[in-house]
């Protein structure tokens, strides 16, 4: 599933491929992906110019002439740009045709991805309604606010980090990596964390996601960037998908449990429950 680093990588790729292009027509083969009014979506997009790209958490943002297209890739969503006629592909569901003859294609094997069209003035309200936390940066991710939110919750720290309210952009892969680096057990109730542990999680969230952006994201199964290239962050994972291997820090065998319905990897020695 694309998490913040993967979405940021897609965003940066699309910036190089489609900025300034004018949409001539749109073709939607799976209408359920469009979560705002379908007729308005089809009517408003032609003649819009893609002015810039952006990202908020795991949401990809297309800033158009007077609209914003919000795209969530969910589990398997991908964008591919074809300068000429694109090939017929089984899992291609939305086609943005440009005046210069190019086409941007949205592909999604699972069909879980979503698209919404808003006026820019409603963007802040949209993300407030999603209860989306701050971006994982030094400027936006306030440690004291984070500690205060943890102190009020009995949720397991992994589940809490995944719900996007504490900080935006973490998913299953990077939560496991952050908690391993911070040496915190994923099932620990949030309110039991010490100030030192909360600080470690805060700092490692910024560090891990920053490193993952630098490495172009993680390719575990099918993720590729807008150029069809794999990321390399998977080569730097220390715990995710390492079940049965030795912890590089202490030599203990990495274990996998189910937590909140999610496969969860941790070191039982470095990340003690009590």
UniProtKB/Swiss-Prot annotation:
GO molecular function: 8-oxo-7,8-dihydroguanine DNA N-glycosylase activity; class I DNA-(apurinic or apyrimidinic site) endonuclease activity; damaged DNA binding; zinc ion binding
ZnF endpoints (FPG-type): 238-272
EC number: 3.2.2.23, 4.2.99.18
GO-annotated biological processes: base-excision repair
Cofactor note: Binds 1 zinc ion per subunit.
Residues holding DNA: 91, 110
Catalytic activity annotation: Hydrolysis of DNA containing ring-opened 7-methylguanine residues, releasing 2,6-diamino-4-hydroxy-5-(N-methyl)formamidopyrimidine; 2'-deoxyribonucleotide-(2'-deoxyribose 5'-phosphate)-2'-deoxyribonucleotide-DNA = a 3'-end 2'-deoxyribonucleotide-(2,3-dehydro-2,3-deoxyribose 5'-phosphate)-DNA + a 5'-end 5'-phospho-2'-deoxyribonucleoside-DNA + H(+)
Active-site annotation: 2-3, 58, 262
Cysteines paired by S-S bonds: none
Subunit structure: Monomer.
PANTHER family per UniProt: FORMAMIDOPYRIMIDINE-DNA GLYCOSYLASE (PTHR22993:SF9)
Protein name: Formamidopyrimidine-DNA glycosylase
Source species: Streptococcus pneumoniae serotype 4 (strain ATCC BAA-334 / TIGR4)
